[in-house]
Amino acid sequence: MDLPIEDSHDSSTSPKGKQPTTAEKSATKKEDKVPVKKQKTRTVFSSTQLCVLNDRFQRQKYLSLQQMQELSNILNLSYKQVKTWFQNQRMKSKRWQKNNWLKNSNGVTQGCLVNPTGNLPMWSNQTWNNSIWSNETQNIQSWSNHSWNTQTWCTQSWNNQAWNSPFYNCGEESLQSCMQFQPNSPASDLEAALEAAGEGLNVIQQTARYFSTPQTMDLFLNYSTNMQPEDV
């Protein structure tokens, strides 16, 4: 009995296996090429180099290209090493100044809020200051009242002196002599009396201009109005 012969598949006629896609190929390539970070070589400075660098940084924080090259030649360092060191020192200096400023500002704020006495409330000092201010205000008001009273007293004294002055008495005497003139006197006596009265009026006018007081002006007007109808 013959067995059935299986069909043998040739390589040329056999179906091809499934090939990977381009995305899978790129993923495998990325997995194979894992990026390795290069560690930066840290420069180790000697004590002499650090001493020279710190001294130069205290005197000058920014160096020119020529100055950095000269300093690198003196210290047997590269230009990049000197430049990097100065950049790092400037950053450290700015950070230190900022932290120090924040500490000082916080200390000042806390010192202002703290009560130094610890026993008395804060408004007690304000009340005491207000009482002192009120006392000073009262003293100023009393002084101003005293000054006003002094000025009033001086004005009254000056008016009394003007009222009792010899100029006023002189005018009054001349007017009284004119008022006592008799109508039966001769014409020459009348003219002499009028001249005396005119001189008295001139004195009164000069006195009124000199003192410029309301009492003197009222007196002059009363005498001038009373004298005219009687002398005519």
From Swiss-Prot:
It is found in: Nucleus. Residues 11-25 have a biased composition (Polar residues). Sequence repeats lie at residues 123-127, 128-132, 133-137, 143-147, 148-152, 153-157, 158-162, 163-167. Keywords: DNA-binding, Homeobox, Nucleus, Repeat, Transcription, Transcription regulation. Residues 123-167 are annotated as: Sufficient for transactivation activity. GO terms for cellular component: nucleus. Pfam families: Homeodomain (PF00046). Residues 1-39 are annotated as: Disordered. GO terms for biological process: cell differentiation; regulation of transcription by RNA polymerase II; stem cell population maintenance. GO terms for molecular function: DNA-binding transcription factor activity, RNA polymerase II-specific; RNA polymerase II cis-regulatory region sequence-specific DNA binding. InterPro entries: Distal-less_Homeobox_TF, HD, Homeobox_CS, Homeodomain-like_sf. Residues 168-232 are annotated as: Sufficient for strong transactivation activity. The keyword Transcription regulation applies. It comes from the Eukaryota. Its main location: nucleus. Coiled coil: none annotated. Signal peptide: none annotated. The keyword Repeat applies. Residues 1-10, 26-35 have a biased composition (Basic and acidic residues). Probable transcriptional regulator. Belongs to the Nanog homeobox family. This is Putative homeobox protein NANOG2. It comes from Pan troglodytes. The gene is NANOGP1.
